[in-house]
Amino acid sequence: MATYAVGDIQGCYRALKLLLKKVKFNADNDHLWVAGDLVNRGPESLKSLRYIKKLGPSATLVLGNHDLHLLAHAYGVRTLNPKDTLAPILTAKDSDELLEWLQAQPLLHYDAEFDAVLVHAGIPPIWSIENALNYALEVEQALSTTQTAAAFFVDMYGNQPDVWQPSLEGTARLRLITNYLTRMRFCSPTGKLELQTKNAPSLPPTGFAPWYTHKHNKWGNTKILFGHWAALMGETRSKQFIGLDTGCVWGGALTMMRLEDGQFFAVDCPC
């Protein structure tokens, strides 16, 4: 029995199947963590979504920004742009079932056995792990009914507010929580977000640094596994912060880590 954590699949179903074959993944005994962005940009988002859903309790998915983007489309808040590859999901015969399942997935997962967190983008240095779990739950509760989810998606998009205040309320609070957990790359020591820059951490915008490089006494030794940042190519220079996005959909590789021993596995992406 083994637990594997995989980076951004983004509709690259063939690469996912090749990687699972490489590690001899057995859904009856093994467990797969998916670091968000299961869909979009790649050619087989529908197959990817169906497969992870079919794994049932053998898979744990946290939502990424592209997954939320799909749900926003489904609620009529956004229209598809030429780069999106989501139309086959929205028109599939099992679309409602797939989207209902996706909407019920968490934004953050903590496993006490491994003392490890799975999140799409990261956790701001001003939050503890407990804070992050509780704040993620606020968004998950907003997604828990059709009425509250519709209101959430209407106001989800935007870069403001860009720094955390416990007094934040309503849609502004939920938007910032979502941006931290699903979009963050660079932030300041006080958690101020910079969401425009997507390049490698060696070229940070002035006053900002990769979120995981700031002082984080509240996290102890908890490992944080994340995706989202393809430009990192998995290099965080830390054993505590595990970057899993190695740019599969951009011609890189699909990467996973076995949590029991920290061993990495990868396949070139035929996406």
Curated annotation (Swiss-Prot):
Reactions catalysed according to its record: P(1),P(4)-bis(5'-adenosyl) tetraphosphate + H2O = 2 ADP + 2 H(+)
Keyword field: Hydrolase
Gene Ontology MF annotations: bis(5'-nucleosyl)-tetraphosphatase (symmetrical) activity
Domain of life: Bacteria
Keyword Hydrolase applies: yes
Annotated EC: 3.6.1.41
Pfam family of the protein (one): Metallophos
Family matches, as HAMAP family: ApaH (MF_00199)
Family per similarity comment: Belongs to the Ap4A hydrolase family.
Function: Hydrolyzes diadenosine 5',5'''-P1,P4-tetraphosphate to yield ADP.
Protein known as: Bis(5'-nucleosyl)-tetraphosphatase, symmetrical
Organism whose genome encodes this protein: Saccharophagus degradans (strain 2-40 / ATCC 43961 / DSM 17024)
